[in-house]
Amino acid sequence: MFTAQTNLVYQGAKQTKRTVLGSLDVINNFKREEILDFYHKWYRPDLQAIIVVGDIDAAQMENKIRSQFSDIPKAVNPTPKEVYLAPKANGPIFENLIDSTLSFTALKVFYRMPYPAREVRSTEAFYKDLYIRDILANIMTERMKEQVRTGKADAKSAVMVNYAESSDYYVDLYTILGKKDGNLLDLIDFYAGNEKSMIEYGVSQDEIEAAKMLVRKRYHLDRPKKAESLRNEDFVGVCHNNFVSGAALTDPATLHGIQNRILKDISLEDVKPYVAKVFSESDKIYSWFANPKDLAKVPSLEDTKARLDQVRAREAKPNFLTFNKIDLTVNYPEGTIVKENNVKGLDGTKEWILSNGAKVYWTAVKDSKVTPDLSLLVYFGSGYNALPQDRFASSLFAGEFIRANAGFRGATADEIGKMPECGGISRSLRISDRFAGIFTTAPAKKAENAFRIAALTVTDPFLPQAKVLQQMKDKKLESLSEPKKDAVRFSEACDSIIYGNHPWSVDIDSAAVDGVDMDLAEEIYSREFNPAAGMTLFIASNLDETTIKEYVRKYIATIPTDGKTVTKAKVRERIPAFKGTQVYSMTGKKEINPYTIVTRMFSSKVKPTPKNLAAVDFVDYILSQRLLNQIRENRGGTYTIRFNSYVSVREKGRSESEITFKTRPDLYEVLVGDLDDIVSEFCSGGPSEKELEEARKWLIKNETESKAKKAMSMPHRNSQVMNYVRNGINPNIDRVAAYGSVTAEDVRKVAGKLTGKNVLTTIYTEE
């Protein structure tokens, strides 16, 4: 798909004939002299860079680099790098893409514009230009989405994205999907009508400000970047981008601040000239993307051109978006913290009992490098057992609708995300087997609003109109109307074998979708996000305790918890239920190329001591290396394969391990034999001393680096406390010390426990 789109952008250029590496014929048949010539032609000093970042003596390192690399001879008459652009377009281009792998029909429109020269890319003007283009693309997307949402468009979905094509072009790409039985020419009306309205009337200041928030998220400018929290890879990235594309060579934290300032300062007057640049003056490529079986529905070139002319001859109307204002005031009387305790085993964490019965676990993080400044998790004691079990599949679909759309105080989730007072605050809802939750993060200046948002999500929830639910149902029903692929049927059969027809192993079928209405959606929300079912909060922040207590009293202790509760079902969570040794295989109809996917699952139990958990990591690492060496390197049978295990501390050591690989149908039996031999030999003989020490070295290094990286994440700090309280996972375990104590015999024994009880092998082939 991406290659096909790139070929449309580069029509007539060398890129459409082959990749940079060459054609398949060249790759398969090159001579030794040719590859050496290629190496000397392009792998030369003037096209290379050495980037070193770390705790080093810079002068000493520079001298070392000079001594090691200075004797490499400079290239004589070096071959200049050439730029291969597409021929200049003489008017709009019309080129369809008909491909049997496509599962949709869409109108694609490409706007192609020159990319800024290298010498411009390190300037503020470059970033301003980039952000304005993104602002316009986001405004167009939001306008089209609103028309689809309100039923004013005959499209199923529509989006416009701005991206760079290999530093040759800026491309704005529309992707507009038609409804199943709709007239595809209506998509031309939709696209061209929005384009003309944009050209004639431009954009509003409110639209620009809302789009800035989306642009800020796209480029991660909403995430704090403090100088003290920068990592080596941040500096490497800046240096790499400067060398490869000419981007600004600036301290990452400083650059982050500059980029935020540039985006903030963009005005309506800055944006106005770009409307013509993008929507009128760019090269335009029109393409229908479709599967051959739908070719009869695709409009002809003549009909497409004629419809474009008709729409552009019509009178356009303003199409500005309007934005609701939201009141974040919480009107309930302030509550109190009635009891405080230190949490045993967790330094810096306290348990507060509130006057409404809610529990709060507060963790003070005294490190300004940890970002963002606040992580707030709200858990409710509901989960799947609080759903109506006789309408379980419908309830799951209602949950999907809630997660995607639920807001508060008359605003949907999408609208909330565009409001300045909510900018920089992340908010998501989740319904799972054990709980429902609200997950929020915020910078310090928006922390109070984050608490308000959490409270209002509980006390004043809002679901959009039934029309939005119907659109979501229509999309789901359309996808369900397609013939079920063999791979999907195989996956469903495997699910049944693995979980033993668990009552929660249900498909959301057409009957389940039809069974969802707004009454059910509202019922599911009230069942799941229900303080009366038990409400526990986890808060981690570098704000002072006095401030956090104030917010908790004003916004959390105020939440009424005396509402109605439902009688929860007593269904146990889904866990693997297969016993003994089982094999399930199926052959399906070939979709593209023949292949076989083999999955070997193990279900067992390992006592979750620190040493055993460390030994599990050794098993995963060493067995993965053995499998890679034999099945990928020696057999050439797959691209990737690994042994991966999970041990539940909460469930007293219940374990799952899995090996999955994709290969050719004629080879899988040999590879399964290899897999059997490797696992059997490892469980009987264990690792060699060399394997053990290599694994130990890598695991200690990975743990040290991973721990340091995760320690800079406030949500990670908070989730550690949550996992300790809810799942019994001790964050204070010294994994490095545990790795240091593991012996070869420990690894062998744990490997036997992981793989020695219940084994399921599933094999799916398409040929």
What are these regions (language model features)?
Residues 1-25, 47-53, 103-124, 144-200, ...:
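M16 family metallopeptidases and their MPP-like homologs
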Residues 28-32, 268, 514-518:
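A conditional alpha-helix N-cap/helix-loop micro-motif detector
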Residues 36-41, 45-151, 188, 290-418, ...:
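His/Glu-rich zincin catalytic helix
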Residues 70-74, 131, 135-136, 183, ...:
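C-terminal, active-site-flanking charged/polar segments
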Residues 250-253, 257-317:
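Extended, hydrophobic interaction surfaces within ordered domains
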Residues 464-469, 565-566:
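Conserved short beta-strand edge segments in small beta-sheet-based binding/regulatory domains
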Residues 751-753:
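Short, exposed beta-strand-loop hairpins at the edges of beta-sheets
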